[in-house]
Amino acid sequence: QAFGFHSASLDVRQNSAFHEKALDQLLRAAGLLDERSFIDWSVEEKRALLDRELRSPRPFLSPGISAGPEADTVLACHRVLAAHIHDFGTSGLGSLIVSMTRRVEDLLIVYLLAREAGLAEWTPKGLRCPLPVVPLFETMGDLEAGPGIVEAFMSHPVTQNSLAALREKLGGDPSFQVMVGYSDSNKDCGIFASQWALHRAQKALSETITQHAAKPVFFHGRGGTVGRGAGPTHWFMDALPHGSLSGSMRMTEQGETIAQKYAHFSSAVYNAEILMASAASATARHRHAKPQALAVEHILDGLAASSRDAYRSLLHTEGFMAFYRTATPIDALENSRIGSRPSRRTGQASLDDLRAIPWVFSWTQARFYLPGWFGAGSALKSLRDERPADYKALAGALRESAFLKYVLTNIESSLVSANANLMRAYAGLVPDETVREAVRAAGGVALERCTPVFM
């Protein structure tokens, strides 16, 4: 109330596919495309064009020429940023976040669009961008590819020029930010596989960034429920991989959790204290304590793969989407106006296009809480039955590993919240008996396997 937004900085976030479409329109307007779209080019062709163009200061088009809706939208945004920097500097501006980053070309395209808008600057050493371009890794595949993408991006001349300018300005090592998505990775492969992929990715990304004389700063895109990455803040900090917290971090707070945590003075003080104290404590451990290798990593690799397979087998069960659309209130959520973003990324009626927010919310409303537990029980039961020695080793590691304690406790809380009677009642809304029984049977078996393992 006293300061409003005066001390805040503004991030700009856009989907990689939107950027690619914008560049395609620019290239076509400049007469640099034949019948083939830039989107259809091979990765090698795209990289060759990007490297060539990023060595040149000239834009594609003269000012005032429209290239297409996506191109005009991105360039208008970047021109506003360039004007702000010209008048006031970079204070108040954050990062250019690229959601659904799949490959390094998704990040280099942003440099080229920034050059076109006059946001990127030409220096004697080449092009540099005054605002950091930040990858957002959201799916399991992208998290696994993340370290390689960041390595290629940080080795690129434009990124090196940009980091060198920051290093000179700060008089020390700059920070390099990476955003990791908890919601979409969970929707992609289930909670256990998602959490393990995030843990491994942050560890590998930290090592990659440190090798380039920069400090890793992770932006944790967490939601307000376990299925979207939520959990006790201090446990979350304790569970972060060693070296991933260097004194600075970011995380999202959802609208509903902001009111819950900070609407009243006493709760605001309590939650702010937990956040700052746990961040300071974890940073001190990461700086001064020696990293402790997790002895059961190979077991967790297999457990994650098993839980992912169980989760995806449910999603690929014949008739699953028909069951989902009838047994949950997803149709009401899609037509509601309560969210800040549309329920689907591009409007396509597919599971891949559905955002994680309505996905988790709909299962919660039907009291399945499926994104918070499905797949974990099946994987643990298989481990216990087929490899009892590994299961015993995992149980022993639970007493020592903050990561395991955090993840399994969150899964347990989701399992306790699920209501089997209400699940059966909602499943009864599905008119096709074959579909209803096939999906309900898969969910019921998973719940039965989960319960004795966790309870």
Residue ranges and their predicted role:
Residues 43-48, 70-88, 103-125, 150-178, ...:
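Structured alpha-helical segments in the cores of large, soluble enzyme domains
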Residues 1-120, 124-132, 141-142, 173-175:
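Active-site-facing alpha/beta catalytic cores
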Residues 21-23, 104-112, 144-148, 188-191, ...:
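A short acidic (Asp/Glu
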Residues 4, 135, 224:
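Conserved, mostly hydrophobic/aromatic
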Residues 136, 148-151, 186-195, 201-211, ...:
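C-terminal structured domains
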Residues 225-249, 253-256:
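Acidic/histidine-rich catalytic neighborhood
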Residues 11-13, 18-20, 32-66, 75-79, ...:
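Acidic, glycine-enriched catalytic cores built around paired aspartates
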Residues 120-137, 161-169, 219-220, 324-325:
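A generic structural motif
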